[in-house]
Amino acid sequence: MDQSKRLLKSAVPNPPEHFKTGISWLDDLDEKDDDSATSVNYDIPEITEANLCNDSHEALSPCTQPVGNSGRPVEAFKTYPSTPAVPSKSVLFHFYEPDENFSLSDTGRTKSDTALAARESSEKSEVPRDTRSAGIKPYKENNSSNCAISKEAGLRRLIDKDRESFDKNLNQSFTNLTFPEPISDDSDSVEFQRDSLNNNWPASLEGSIHELPRNSDDDGIPASAAHILDLDYHRDSYDSPWKKFLPYPSILSDDSWKAPESWGTSLPTEAIPKQVFTTRFFARPSLGNRKKEFFLRVYRDDRTSVSFICPIGIQTHEVIKLLARLFFLPSSANFYLLLIQFNTERILLPHEQPCIIFERLLSLFGCKVTSDEEINEEDNYSVARLVFTTMDIGADVLRKFSEKKITANLDISRSNLEVIPVKIYPYAHELISLNVSHNLSLDLPLDFMERCVKLKRLDISNNLRSPRGKPITALRQLEVLNMSRNDIYELDPLIFSGLSRNSLKELNIANNKLFFLPHSTRYLVNLTYLDLSYNNFVTFPLIITELSQLETLNFSHNLLSQISSKIGSLVKLKHLYLQFNDLSNRLPQEIGLLKNLETIDLSYNAITNIASLSECPKLNSINVACNLLSFYEYSNPSATFIDFSFCPLTTIDPAFSYSNLVYFDISHAKLIGLKDSVIETLVNVETVKVNYNHFTSISDAISAMQNLKYLSCTNCEMSYVSPNLGKLKHLVHLDLHANNIKIFPEEVWQVSSLKVVNLSSNILEKIKLPVATSKKLTRTISQLKIMRTLSGNPVSSLSSQEFVMPTVEELYLVDNRLGNDCFTALEYFKCLKVLNLSYNYLTEIPSKFFQNFSDLKHLFVSGNELANLSISSTAQVLLETLYANGNRLSSFPKNEALSKSLRFLDISTNNLQNLAVEKAEKKSLTKLPQLEYLNLSGNTWFRFSEHEDTNFTKSYLKNLKFLSIMDLNTKFSNAPSDVLNHFIQRNSPQPNILRYGVCGYLSRSIPVISACELVVNNFLHPQSSLYCVLDSDISAGKNNRVLKFVYDNLASCLAHEINAADSSSEQICNALRRGFLRLNKKLGNVIHYDLRKSSEGDVDSNYVTTMNISEKGYSMDSSCLDIGVSIILVYVRDTRAFVANVGTSMAIMSTRNDSEPTTLSVMHDVYNRDEIRRIVDSCGFISGEIKSTTTRAIGRLSQFPGVQAVPYVNVQYLSELNEFIILANQEFWSVLSKRTVIDVVRANRHSPLLASTKLRDYAIAYGAEKNVLVVIVELNGLFEENSLNFNQLRGDEKTLAISEKNDNMSFVQDLPDDSSLARMNREVSPPKGCIAMVFTDIKNSTLLWERHPIAMRSAIKTHNTIMRRQLRATGGYEVKTEGDAFMVCFQTVPAALLWCFSVQLQLLSADWPNEIVESVQGRLVLGSKNEVLYRGLSVRIGVNYGVTVSELDPITRRMDYYGPVVNRTSRVVSVADGGQIAVSAEVVSVLNQLDSETMSSEKTNVNEMEVRALKQIGYIIHNLGEFKLKGLDTTEMISLVYPVQLQGRLERLIKSRSLGTPTALPETQTYTPVRSRSNSLRPMLARLSDSKSVHGEEGGSGKRSVSSLRNVSPSESTGGYEGCIFDDQQYQLLYELCERLEDHAAILHGFPEPPPCDTGLAAPVNQAEEYSLFYRLTLRIENTIYCVSQMLGHTG
């Protein structure tokens, strides 16, 4: 019989004294709290009925009692099981959309879970009231006996029965409700009105009862009704048509009571949809294409998983239902779906779409959403995972709180909270600081916040959800509010309109997505600190200008284009941060009204004028680095910190002094010097950096800087240092490397405080010391000047007792011109701890030299001509570091003290035969007990003794961490490298056509392996190689397990993806990207595995199999989540180089006849604007234990999605012109410029190992402190037909290098007085005979000198550097210069034109001063395709060819040229305009004959390379006609030659001359550039021959001819195509073969390049497509052959 449920009153108003809930951990918590005198006992409701729940089916919390508006708690109630009643059609259990602020109850379960547990327990027949402590029983034990109706059909049949009986019984049940007495500590509560609940109380709950419309459809079943009738309440609950009806008047209603927000409930009127402030993907993702299928994988608590395909728009409750059926569960009501990312987790709301959320996370990880393979692959455990669970989320948290003492400063961050724990409530009124950050599902309830009456600091950052304003407004004393990194698009206006608006002082809303601020921001009248960094502000919010008390404003990393003129109203502003915006032009004048401004940061903008800052009297810190300032003529007398670095400054002339300045940085500017008047005002400055300027000298006025401690003036072309530098008594660090200093004043050595001096890469020949008086008193500076003038005696001839002992501890003299006499002066440096004399001209070290240095710990003498180290066996030498590579050592010094103290030893590239460190060679290696770094590479005669174990690193050198044995002709153990313990650097045992060199530096301060290389020859293919540099951000004392993992698994992950792709360039690039992502996922799985294993012990095999990891453990801990690895790799395959990188490692490539390298990678750091915007858009962050600026890396998983592993990938098509590729880590590139790197490698191109070692040594000399690693890959071996020629050239270069060292003194005399040019290739001998003469001139130079004299001084230096560097690279001879004009000559016309083309192209990209670029003569001019045509100085060039008369100039000692050819060349250049290259008829004739047989027979190897390089660039010849040149009797035919990249200049010229001129224009010849690919077809033919042979169709008798397919008529195939002639890879090979044929013809015969085609080629899907494809390929080949035949004169 039908009967309604009975709701009876509780017999006892309060629970018994020893009441038990049946939940073990909760009962234990209550027992521990009994002894606490301050705790508040909350009543536990006896039974919570299932229908008494909110609109989200979240039951009332069993740990708190509902408190009405009157302040009294509501009594608990209980139900007894009975036959369920059937609702009538006039009644609707209305179900609202779930609240987005989904939360858990205080027990950790959802409220619906508690209600379900109570209902299941109550359905047992005749259960006594006090047996509730027995716990929750499984539903399946009594589901068959207690459920009256279990199917929808039954519900529809019974829905019309006993409607009136149901209403009557139900109303009677609610009438009998009573409630216990209140237990509340709320002082503001009022007397509770009991009569207000009569017959109306259930209406206050969001599962309230409403009338059902008569015409309603019966197909949709109300969720509340389904819940009461024991049906699955998830069915159609969120897509049901019932939702569209508005609330009807409830049967029972009471407006006097409202449930607290900590219950997660709300009134029905509040359930009406309204404006929502939530995050992008934690609110309601768009449905998208619901029909699209998505592969979803869900885990269970036991770590097993299930995978299935579902629609991408499926909602959470639907997934739960599906999982319940898959796991054969009777009900899904007690289950949740957790989204877990590392240590954070969140319960997905019923209406959310897990697939869309998961797809979004995968896209942030780097997967392509359009690729089903990447999105649907199973191995996504490390990105995020979904867990189907019933476990109590809050249980572990509350257990911790039971053991933790709650203080006034409470930190519950990273606790995965759903609600505020109950234990905190009694202490709420005592809290002063509350940190609830990193809790993704936590929403602060209003009732709890109302209790926090003393709260002053609230941190709700990193919760990835927009906070509601109402709870925050209840905080009356809130002073500090942190809402950073919450993915906020728009702030709730209520946040700033409540009680806290008057007390709030600090507000942090950084790292969100805000475009504007709400109008209520103006109410924050006492706000002093506002952080709006890392947002999307485009305009300056005017509301901020109304915050009159503001002292600190951070607007960095936004998109501001200008600053409001009303900013002057912020009269109390002290700190203003505006870096990394889009500010341009001048600052508003109103900034000068900020009289209290102390700090301003405007770096990384485009500001041109900061004159308004001079009006700020208290401004002490100014940072305008990386702007467009060209002059600064203002003053800030109170300034103590000024940073003008990376600004094109040409003038600094302040109106007032900088007497308070302490830090001054003007590096990377365009300054030619500082005025003495400016220097004299810097009386208190302590740090000065003027690197990368055009300083020629250090002025005598520097003596005014009496407090100077640090001076850095590097890469300035400086040749003179003032002796007054010796007057700086507080100078500690002096860095003058990479200049042209020939004489260093001896007065500097008498500065007693001087500790570090770096004079590397200068042209020093001697070291002079100051001379002391007989009374051992230092002479004055003036006396030293007189002595230096009157006496010409060298230092060695004076008495040793007259010299001052310098106090320098670190002395760097690398890359100078010092001889053996330098040791005489160095003997007086008794305090030396570091001495670096590498790359000088030393042949012998005095035998007694080491006896005087008791403190010397680190000695570097690499790159000299030392035959021995002259260390006696009895000398007490306690060196820790000894670098003696690149010498002629045949034996190691046998010194017992030395062998015991050595930690870092590099004796590579010598003539060593063994490593005997004592007289008895037996077990000699045991005498190196402290050795950590050993480099033996390049000792081709080295042999291990017979008694030495091949595995000696474990037997003898137990502390050894790094061993390099490259190019050793000896057998060695094949034990693999262990990055954690012993890393072995060796050549690959597999043969390879590419030579490479590797060298590394193990930091003395942090001797931990943080960088290593990975080289795999014959990687996947015989003609393929893989070269990688791995660099990690490891701190001291930590073993880099992440680096070891990447080293072990990188190659396998790449191989897995490349094998699955075809050979097209696009597919390989995509495979490299997928390989990086695969490696990062695998790393995450391993870290999870090791963390779980360390916390739980052994992990079952199912878990290992599920995450697809090997059983090899790396013992990773939680710190590994903050460690990342930067990778730069080059994958050379046939004649293509695929480059991929993440992080800050970088690669460059050198090309013959080009002085500038090509950058192959992208730096992923916080200085990259694109990376900053990506981080802001993904709501990521860059922080953590490892303070790194890297934005992409393998690892650093704790900072996802701010840090991702998506690489930058590109492909370079190689040719014979490409010389080498250089890969190195960040520390290497931070101290060495690209130009220096290219110059050093080119000078040592005969040996990549020697070049890499020299680069390592230069990095040490220039200031590298961390680990350094560099890899050089030589590319010449790719082209077999020219390998002999290249080997011969390398042999000649090596012979030349050896002869130069043998006759080093004469070689030194021939070097120029420019250290940068001296590093490059030696200047060619003066050309003779028929030569190409070139004249250059700068257009409008006189006018520019008149208008911008200071800027022109800097511009001329830039111009001269480009000219001279390109001359060395191309092989030209500089005859002389006259003003700004150059006269140079070349042996061949192609070399001359190569130089002209390169110069014109480099002038466009040069770093000119702003005054030049903004002038009319040097302004930017763009072409029709938006390409740069003119920018900066415009240079005209004239070229002529013929026989000249040469004679050596006795004054300059350079060859000079005379004769008619020279005169005609000077006239030809006058015909050209700025940016034009005018050539004579002789030059055009030579160009036309380049392909003739006569010219080909006369070509040399070098000439052939020049011709190929010229045709690769491409050029255009435009005939101007005949000209009568000044001083010449006959007319001259003049033509213009342009590189193809500057074709727009010719178009502009033709267009300007054709206006108003109908006459025909002269003829133009075009030589289009060919693609930069191999001219050799051998690699392609080899690849094609290695593929499987062509087969015929199934059932065919034989192979088909490709050419025969032309005459076959294509026909459409109706059925599926079962097979092709070739597979995908072979089709791609054929496609590339056609391209190589066309390139080959174009290079040899100058034929124009064919139209560009698709990058990839897949196999045809039917026979018609196959025939069409072969027809196109065959036609292209025949067209190429026909064109070549026509050009060669063949017909027929």
Curated annotation (Swiss-Prot):
Region of interest: Disordered: 1-22, 103-142, 1585-1614
Domain Ras-associating as annotated: residue spans: 292-380
BP GO terms, sorted: adenylate cyclase-activating glucose-activated G protein-coupled receptor signaling pathway; cAMP biosynthetic process; intracellular signal transduction; negative regulation of induction of conjugation with cellular fusion; negative regulation of transcription by RNA polymerase II
Binding site for Mn(2+): 1337, 1380
UniProt signal peptide: none
Protein's name in the database: Adenylate cyclase
Keywords, comma-separated and alphabetical: ATP-binding, cAMP biosynthesis, Cytoplasm, Leucine-rich repeat, Lyase, Magnesium, Metal-binding, Nucleotide-binding, Repeat
Gene behind this protein: cyr1
Annotated cofactor note: No activity with magnesium.
Bias (Basic and acidic residues): 120-132, 1585-1597
